[in-house]
Every structure is written in C-alpha cells, then in structure tokens.
Amino acid sequence: MSHNDTIVAQATPPGRGGVGILRISGLKARDVAQAVLGKLPKPRYADYLPFNDVDGTPLDQGIALWFPGPNSFTGEDVLELQGHGGPVILDLLLKRILTLPGVRIARPGEFSERAFLNDKLDLAQAEAIADLIDASSEQAARSALNSLQGAFSARVNHLVEALTHLRIYVEAAIDFPDEEIDFLSDGKIEAQLNGVMADLDAVRAEARQGSLLREGMKVVIAGRPNAGKSSLLNALAGREAAIVTDIAGTTRDVLREHIHIDGMPLHIIDTAGLRDASDEVERIGIERAWQEIEQADRVLFMVDGTTTSAVDPAEIWPDFIERLPAKLPITVVRNKADVTGEALGLSEVNGHSLIRLSARTGEGVEVLRNHLKQSMGFDTSMEGGFLARRRHLQALEEAANHLQQGKAQLLGAWAGELLAEELRLAQQALSEITGEFTSDDLLGRIFSSFCIGK
C-alpha cells in the first residue's frame, strides 16, 4: 500500500457511544471535506455541519475539524468528523467517504506511522502512544506520556550526540598521528568514554524501571496440593479469585490475576498442585503448570509448614528443584505460620529467599509484596520516568557491550581504529531506539500492533 493514499478510520472504540470520530489523512482529505461537508472548514476551528451522503441528504451532523499539513498529527492534511457514536451511523459515513477515489481504510497504526515518516514523532514517541492507551496504572500512564513528550528520546539523543563528539575526537587522533600530543593515551578520551558509559548506565536503569511498568513481572505460585497456593493468590489479589477447599487438587487449571504493588504490575499465576495424577484433567492441569513455571520471572515455591520443618528447597522437594529451569529465581514460602507458630518474616537460606507467612490470615503477606518489588529492582521513588520496551533494553544492552569492547581496545592496545568502530556500532544501536536506523520489517511489526485509528 502506498503512503500517498488518503486513509480513513474510526478513531473511537467500536460499539455504541455518545460520540464517534472518523479521521481522514492525506492528499484527498480536502476533497472529502468538500464532498461530505460542502465546504472546507476554517483551519483548527470547530465547525458544526451536516455530514452529507452522495445525493446530498444528511447522514449525521456534528463537529468538523480541519488541520492542513504540515501542522497536523500526521504532517498531512487531516480532517476529523465528530458525530454520534452509533455503529450504523459511523458505518454509513465511512462507506460514503470510501466512495471517493483515492481513499482507503487505514491499516492498524498507519496514522502514527505516517507521523513517524513525516518526522512529527520519532519511533520511541510513536510507541508511547500505544503504551499510553494500554497503560494499566496511573504511574504507567504518566511514564508513557513522558515518553510521548520526548523524555526517553531526549536521553537517547544526548547519548548519541556525546558519542558523535567522542568519535570525532578519536578519529582526529587516528587521522593526525604525527601531532605532538597523543590523544589516545593522554587520558582525555578515556575520561570522555567513562562519562558516556556512566550516562548510559543511568538510562539503562531507568529503562529497566520503565520496562517493569509496561510489562510487569510474571510470578508463578507452585507446590504440592493443599499447600495454600490458591489462598496466597487470593491474599495477594485482595479478593476471592480462586476457590479454596480442603480437598487436594481443587485447582486443576491455571488461574491468573493482575495486580499492582506500588505501581509495579504483577501477573500472579496460581497453578494446579504438582503430583503424580491419575485423573486426566488434573494431569493436563499439571502440565500447564510446568509450562507457566518455565516462562516465569520468579517462582513462589509454596510449602505447607505443618508437613515439614525443612527450609532448603532441595531438601523439601529435590525432584521439583531439579526440573526447574536454570537460573530461575525461587522464593520459598512456608505457609500456615499461624498454625506452626513460626516467626513471620524474610530470611535467606542457601542462596534462596525464605518467607514465613499465613495466607489464610494475611499475616506476612505484606513482607512478600515488598520482597517481590525489591527482587525486581523496582523503585517507587523514581519520578519523571519513561516506559521502555524489550527492544529498547536490547538496544541499550548492545550499546553498553560495544562501549565495553571499545574501552578494552583503548586500554589494552591503544587501537584507535577498533575503538572508533565500537563507538559507531554503539551509536547505531542507540539510534535504533528512535528509528534513525531501523529496518522496514521492524517498523511494520511495531505499527501493526496499534489501534486502527491511531
């Protein structure tokens, strides 16, 4: 599809509503205004007009807004028609507009894509539009808005600019080797490089916070039947999300709850009790439990404190520990402290965190909440942050690795050419975040996840 086409889409959610908005962008937007409204509205002024069919009879009436390019969201001529939000009315108006030559339905995210291609937004800002719409908490929404307003892009652009200056300095040292001053060994380049690396580390720390805000943490509650897994899910969720009985094997499928701990999204997953099951339904539930465990960020290993005094997970259930993916963090949760009389709280045992609590009474659950937040490095005190995606983290990590390699070349062999190449690669990795160096395939994947009218 051509970017020269004029596109139209509904900008409001599908279904009935008080207001429904159609957005038109492109060279033919002016023709749409003349055909549907009978005139071109005054730029950036609300005009109350009938929306006319092909034969001139009104289909609806409402507000028309005209934004001539380049002073519009997409950078093109944009017309917005704000009418009544009935699906039939909007469908009739959409069909009327599509009768005009050169106008087609927009692809998902095509309005934002055009804004990016016309330099109205960089790629990180365009992604922030979708993140703002999908925000699941107030803190995530504020951070997404910061990204949309350019906070993340400004940090990245500052790093790119610093790398540009450093590359100029390094390449000057390479091009003028006969100068009396040895630029590579006089310490100035190393000092500048260390400064850029420190700034990059700070951005990476904020980006990790932003990624947590956007994607959350996946925590799976696992253990033997009747250990109190469903009771813990209910305690963390603050509601009766799971059925709790004294019958072993009550939970036979995966249960999911989405909560927030001081703004950090948490995906809690309750699983079927793990055992050798003869029942086919329970067996399938146990297999699903293992699938969830393998994809978790952390596992809460639930232990019935009345059945064992052991605290080392390898001693409590060695077969379970052996099957866990390598490097998957585990928190041992000894439940039923209200019955055993154990002291509530958090401790460390053989490299694993151990929490004693009572899921039934809720005692010690707040300790677990704080532990989950701290284990992911989530900092609630960070203000003015931004959201980040996995591709952003990967790009920042790649840039950091190139700078480390460059520093090794500088200090190990004074290899200016190799240092310059590592700086170039780091700069390229950072530029992928804002879209300065990004493949068309990646752009297609990013914008295809947007709403149709965005």
From Swiss-Prot:
It is an enzyme of class 3 (hydrolase). One of its GO terms (biological process) is tRNA wobble uridine modification. GO terms for cellular component: cytosol. K(+) binds at residues 226, 245, 247, 250. It comes from the Bacteria. One of its GO terms (molecular function) is GTPase activity. Its cofactor is K(+). Its main location: cytoplasm. It is found in: Cytoplasm. (6S)-5-formyl-5,6,7,8-tetrahydrofolate binds at residues 23, 80, 120, 454. InterPro entries: G_TrmE, GTP-bd, GTP-bd_TrmE_N, GTPase_MnmE, MnmE_dom2, MnmE_helical, P-loop_NTPase, Small_GTP-bd. The keyword Membrane does not apply. Residues 216-377 form the TrmE-type G domain. PROSITE patterns: G_TRME (PS51709). Its EC number is 3.6.-.-. It holds the Pfam family MMR_HSR1. Mg(2+) binds at residues 230, 251. PANTHER family: TRNA MODIFICATION GTPASE GTPBP3 (PTHR42714), TRNA MODIFICATION GTPASE GTPBP3, MITOCHONDRIAL (PTHR42714:SF2). Exhibits a very high intrinsic GTPase hydrolysis rate. Involved in the addition of a carboxymethylaminomethyl (cmnm) group at the wobble position (U34) of certain tRNAs, forming tRNA-cmnm(5)s(2)U34. Homodimer. Heterotetramer of two MnmE and two MnmG subunits. Belongs to the TRAFAC class TrmE-Era-EngA-EngB-Septin-like GTPase superfamily. TrmE GTPase family. This is tRNA modification GTPase MnmE. It comes from Klebsiella pneumoniae (strain 342).
